Amino acid sequence: AYKELYLKEEDVMNDDDYAFLSNKLQIKLSNPNKKIKSYGAGLPDDVFTRIIDLAKINGVTAHEQFNHPDTGHLPGGWLKLDYIERAMQEYKFGGKYPRRKYDYTDMLIEFNKKDLDDLPQFDVVIIDEAQDLSWLQWQMVKRIAEKTKRLYIAGDDDQAIFKWAGARPEFLINMKGTRKVLS
């Protein structure tokens, strides 16, 4: 997504951006991109950006994610979350600040908005660990598959370990196509 959107390093939300927002809002916000670089996966440490990111990953509004039974208690409630989400959107995509800044989840969303004609074409695509893909990542796979000659998807729903980060193993389970079970 980064490459296909022609982004540069300065287009990606970084620690300075989150520090600026934290200072402006007087709330400690964490950089979700930092965890992904360090560990390969992760959600923000603070509950506010975690809920906002999970909403984007799951293709729902922040309000719907806030009301999800797994969300739990949120200090400050919905009004505080809404305030933070609006401030982040204004900072990243318009308003007073003349910039477009993306976190990794935003990149996937923008990639999925691209016209099919503008997407890369591949002879073969191999997706591994598919049981740990989120709804948003599955949308990306579907888009890429439309311009791919052969698509191989590997995964084991019994090995799904990233449900806490939005993984949706049911998409792998319900996938149509030829199946070959390896033992």
Where in this protein do the model-derived segments appear?
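Conserved P-loop NTPase-based nucleic-acid remodeling module centered on helicase motor cores
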Residues: 1-46
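Conserved helicase motor core of SF1/SF2 NTP-dependent helicases
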Residues: 124, 131-183
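Accessory N-terminal region flanking or inserted into the helicase ATPase core
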Residues: 28-126, 135-140, 163
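Phosphate-binding beta-loop-alpha motif at adenosine-nucleotide cofactor sites
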Residues: 9, 103, 181-183
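Residue-level signal for well-ordered alpha-helical scaffold segments within enzymatic catalytic domains
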Residues: 4, 106-110, 143, 174
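Generic structural marker for isolated residues within well-ordered, non-membrane alpha-helices
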Residues: 18, 22, 51-52, 172
